[in-house]
Amino acid sequence: MGHTHSRQLFVHMLSVMLKHRGITVSKTKLINFLSFIEEVCPWFPREGTVNLETWKKVGEQIRTHYTLHGPEKVPVETLSFWTLIRDCLDFDNDELKRLGNLLKQEEDPLHTPDSVPSYDPPPPPPPSLKMHPSDNDDSLSSTDEAELDEEAAKYHQEDWGFLAQEKGALTSKDELVECFKNLTIALQNAGIQLPSNNNTFPSAPPFPPAYTPTVMAGLDPPPGFPPPSKHMSPLQKALRQAQRLGEVVSDFSLAFPVFENNNQRYYESLPFKQLKELKIACSQYGPTAPFTIAMIESLGTQALPPNDWKQTARACLSGGDYLLWKSEFFEQCARIADVNRQQGIQTSYEMLIGEGPYQATDTQLNFLPGAYAQISNAARQAWKKLPSSSTKTEDLSKVRQGPDEPYQDFVARLLDTIGKIMSDEKAGMVLAKQLAFENANSACQAALRPYRKKGDLSDFIRICADIGPSYMQGIAMAAALQGKSIKEVLFQQQARNKKGLQKSGNSGCFVCGQPGHRAAVCPQKHQTSVNTPNLCPRCKKGKHWARDCRSKTDVQGNPLPPVSGNWVRGQPLAPKQCYGATLQVPKEPLQTSVEPQEAARDWTSVPPPIQY
């Protein structure tokens, strides 16, 4: 059987089944019997469920085990237990035997008219079990004693009659119908009246619930009788279910009165999730927000009694708002009651407000269907007349776009929150456009900044449609390659988009090729170019300037003249004219002789120029 729990359960079921047939067997013997079956038949069902076919296979396996190992390996009571359980599982034969007994009883007269009816004696035992009349002498003759010993020796050599199934003549359906008719006629002749289906009998107490097998085996305690069903309103049913599921229903604590079982109507419970969302909407968005009003309209389609509306309003509204709603609700009910009085409708003011003789909830459950529609209409109209709560906008600041969230999803969340708070569509769109830019992430803000005052919300969504995680990775890689921050890269793209450089087909500088500036303002354009020296013209040996050449010979080995320190003369100056007294030196050829030179001549005076 596997587990101990399943073994005990199966033993208990076998014990009950055998006891039903008048056979008492101890549980110890049944446990030993099942242990032997587990040893012989390892495939025996572990779930403890058997039928007649399975039990026959068990018998064949026991027979094989007996043939191979002999009678010493088979307990004595195994054959008896197997036969008894086989008879319990063979339901068809049991029913046929009962029908046969009924047929036999039908053939005998039930009673005589002049005598008191008496019970028939039990049917005689089958011929195989009939005992011979006992003699006074209990001793057996030698012949009978020898025959008994011979039969006992052949006991284990028989072909196991317990495996053979009795095959009696099956009773057809027509025979059973005919038998039932004969029994009915016999009962009528005997003066016994059969109960008619039209007679009404007092209702019997409900049967106890069907116990599970574990309870029947004594492993689990039996469950108690179910409490009598109570008719509750839809709100009270919803709160019952929520309390069983572990929800906190402290705000609806007045929803569990005692009821009488005198109502035959059928009621459905409200989903507690709807009530919970209504309370959250009233606390976050206000009682007159569009989202809250939509939930009240949905709740108004249910047939709620007045006490349910009062309890819902008390739990969802503040103290002041509840008093305002209650006074407005009573006023609406008074108007409806006046109209009902004029139209001859039997729905009074006390019924609509649930006061006076209609204060109990079980009494309110017996109203006419039209009364619930009027009560719901009055409750909805009173709810709509509560003061608006336009100051509940603190949650809008929490609606921000995540770093990897698509922009369209962020705008959808923003519009949903604004729609629950503001009823004016135009004002809501203006606020949505403002928050769609301010609460967006840095990448979307950089893309939307040039179009902040030009485009609308649809343009914002179209511009930021491609901005996602891959876009942010590209911006980060560009910033790393250029050695700039992400903010500088975004500003650079914004400036490029603003100047329209993308339309020119080249977004970089024509001089240096770097993005971010034009060729006119390129910083590399005004830098002085540094020329590198070529082959030296003096020595023809290396690349250096001639003024830096220090070679003595040229490339062919010819000696080079020495380089003076200032052989590179500068740019010749223009001749200067000195006005005033000048010393005129005669132009004479250079004399290389050693003769003494002539003395210098005297100074001469020259008139000043006309103009300076």
Curated annotation (Swiss-Prot):
Residues 103-148, 589-612 are annotated as: Disordered. Changing residue 298 to N: In strain: JSRV-21. A lipid is attached at residue 2 (N-myristoyl glycine). Changing residue 385 to R: In strain: JSRV-21. The keyword Zinc-finger applies. Residues 119-128 have a biased composition (Pro residues). A motif (PPXY motif) lies at residues 208-211. The keyword Coiled coil applies. SUPFAM superfamilies: Retroviral matrix proteins, Retrovirus capsid dimerization domain-like, Retrovirus capsid protein, N-terminal core domain, Retrovirus zinc finger-like domains. It holds the Pfam family Gag_p24. A motif (PTAP/PSAP motif) lies at residues 202-205, 287-290. GO terms for cellular component: viral nucleocapsid. Gene3D superfamilies: 1.10.1200.30, Human Immunodeficiency Virus Type 1 Capsid Protein, Retroviral GAG p10 protein, Zinc finger, CCHC-type. GO terms for biological process: viral budding via host ESCRT complex; viral translational frameshifting. Changing residue 28 to P: In strain: JSRV-21. Keywords: Capsid protein, Coiled coil, Host-virus interaction, Lipoprotein, Metal-binding, Myristate, Phosphoprotein, Repeat, Viral budding, Viral budding via the host ESCRT complexes, Viral matrix protein, Viral nucleoprotein, Viral release from host cell, Virion, Zinc, Zinc-finger. Signal peptide: none annotated. GO terms for molecular function: nucleic acid binding; structural constituent of virion; zinc ion binding. The record marks 99-100, 129-130, 168-169, 256-257, 477-478, 579-580 as: Cleavage. A zinc finger (CCHC-type) spans 507-524, 534-551. Transmembrane segments: none annotated. This is Gag polyprotein. The lineage of its organism: Viruses, Riboviria, Pararnavirae, Artverviricota, Revtraviricetes. The gene is gag.
